[in-house]
């Protein structure tokens, strides 16, 4: 995985996110999901991914197939909900110039969901879940169910990865 990009590159790879929630019969529970810029949190997640072989394997890296993974885009999200239904549909979207360069339209994308947990001593650890997104019109779209989002909690980071052969 590449080292921390320069400021110019960081501006190029800057992502923006959005979220849409729909429920049964169009009923939307009281949910507010916002994309946020959290550089420190994203840095911690990237450190985890670069140093954890099991996590890389879960994301698609394989010694046998000689494949590695490359992080293409990250986006932190914050969710406030009082009544998210388990069956509700939550669509998270990540937009970045990198996506158009890295993926074909309609390509399936492995997305790691990094969920922070603060221990009693103040240290933060992350639990990772793997979901699949899809590239639609140059954006990565991840469709989740309400029960998944509730599991992730109020604060999480989506990390899109690309498997690279060779």
List the predicted regions and their residue ranges.
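Feature for mature exported/ectodomain regions
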Residues: 1-75, 80-123, 161-166
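Extracellular adhesion/glycan-binding regions together with long Ser/Thr-
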Residues: 71-78, 137, 142-146
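Hydrophobic residues in beta-strands and at strand termini
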Residues: 94-96, 135, 144
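Polyanion-binding catalytic cores of nucleic-acid enzymes and NTP/SAM-utilizing transferases
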Residues: 126
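Short, surface-exposed loop motifs enriched in S/T, G, D/E and P with embedded aromatic residues
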Residues: 129-137
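C-terminal beta-strand-rich structural cap/linker in extracellular carbohydrate-active enzymes
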Residues: 139-166
């Amino acid at each position: 995985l590449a080292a921390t990009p320069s400021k110019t590159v960081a501006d190029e790879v800057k992502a923006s996110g959005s979220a849409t929630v729909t429920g049964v019969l169009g009923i939307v529970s009281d949910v507010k999901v916002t994309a946020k810029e959290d550089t420190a949190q994203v840095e911690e997640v990237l450190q985890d991914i670069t140093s954890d072989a099991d996590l890389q394997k879960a994301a698609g890296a394989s010694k046998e197939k000689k494949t590695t993974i490359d992080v293409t885009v990250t986006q932190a999200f914050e969710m406030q909900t009082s009544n998210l239904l388990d069956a509700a549909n939550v669509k998270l979207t990540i937009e970045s110039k990198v996506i158009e360069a890295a993926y074909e339209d309609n390509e399936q994308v492995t997305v790691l969901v990094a969920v922070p947990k603060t221990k009693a001593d103040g240290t933060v650890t992350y639990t990772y879940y793997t979901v699949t997104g899809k590239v639609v019109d140059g954006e990565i779209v991840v469709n989740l169910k309400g029960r998944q989002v509730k599991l992730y909690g109020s604060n999480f980071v989506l990390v899109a990865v690309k498997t690279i052969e060779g």
